């Protein structure tokens, strides 16, 4: 059985025991969370599509750890204007393990 979930403005296709790297949205390591289910698929080709969510379907997950993404450099420049700006960014992420898909 698989599900398509939505978290952090992105969609992920997950199955039981998958480990995902998603954007951090609160909670501590070891906490259990429920994720929104957009689509649910099972054995035999059965498919439930939500509008926008599947009623009664839940994906239970556990936060494994908090991490940070790679450093991204932002550089802005306007030619002949002596205008240069350099910035950096690292996204806060968390590893999530899918425990159960019910629905």
UniProtKB/Swiss-Prot annotation:
Q: Name one GO biological process term.
A: translation
Cellular component (GO) terms are: cytoplasm; ribonucleoprotein complex; ribosome
Mind telling me what this protein is named? Answer: Large ribosomal subunit protein bL21
Give any Pfam family that matches.
Ribosomal_L21p
Self-association or partners: how does it assemble? Answer: Part of the 50S ribosomal subunit. Contacts protein L20.
- Respond yes or no to whether keyword rRNA-binding is given for this record: yes
Q: Which family does it belong to?
A: Belongs to the bacterial ribosomal protein bL21 family.
Q: Which UniProt keywords apply?
A: Ribonucleoprotein, Ribosomal protein, RNA-binding, rRNA-binding
> Coiled-coil annotation: which residues?
none
Q: What does the function comment of this entry state?
A: This protein binds to 23S rRNA in the presence of protein L20.
